[in-house]
């Protein structure tokens, strides 16, 4: 019940769907929920209500401007709030998508008008799917924070330093949950081989 939160806290997260979603997430964590997933989608994303920023969907730069304030406010409020409440050892916050976006901007005719999209037929910039390099945000969970891990080449096309894959991503979460990733199996057939990120790296 978000009405139990004071106005200052609700304003801090943002009086919009994303802000109130992440405030609810914090409340559920305080109530004892161990694993929680929330998705920042819907009207705050733009015309098609997701982050699929192909040129036919969104004007990628307008879409980022359209989302940035609500995203930054909600995510930073959650991370700060977790630290201020002393939950930063117990709670691991991971903000990610499923892949990156092409470093090279593509141009295609827009398929429709609306938030973060040009009128139908107007050529607009976009970015397509790109699995070779992307980033995520990690906070809390007892991790050493305030740093970057890894790097891409100058064009942002490929990871060139401290390359981590999905196995590393999952193994780090498993480690936080007290699960030995060496014993995790996918589909009960193949061993899910990965190493967690070292606590000191």
What is the predicted function of each stretch?
Residues 1-201:
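Ligand-binding pockets and gating/stacking loops
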């Amino acid at each position: 019940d978000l009405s139990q939160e004071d106005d200052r806290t609700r304003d801090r997260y943002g009086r919009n769907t994303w802000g109130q979603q992440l405030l609810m997430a914090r409340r559920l964590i305080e109530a004892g929920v161990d694993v929680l997933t929330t998705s920042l989608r819907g009207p705050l994303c733009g015309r098609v209500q997701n982050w699929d920023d192909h040129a036919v969907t969104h004007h990628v730069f307008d879409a980022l401007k359209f989302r940035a304030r609500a995203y930054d406010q909600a995510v930073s409020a959650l991370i700060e709030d977790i630290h201020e409440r002393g939950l930063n050892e117990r709670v691991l916050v991971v903000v990610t998508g499923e892949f990156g976006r092409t470093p090279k901007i593509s141009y295609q005719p827009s398929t429709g008008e609306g938030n973060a999209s040009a009128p139908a037929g107007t050529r607009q910039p976009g970015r397509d799917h790109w699995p070779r390099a992307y980033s995520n945000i990690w906070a809390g969970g007892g991790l050493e924070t305030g740093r970057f891990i890894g790097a891409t080449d100058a064009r942002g096309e490929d990871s060139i330093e401290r390359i981590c894959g999905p196995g590393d991503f999952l193994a780090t979460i498993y480690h936080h949950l007290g699960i030995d990733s060496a014993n995790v199996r996918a589909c009960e057939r193949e061993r899910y081989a990965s190493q967690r990120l070292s606590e000191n790296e």
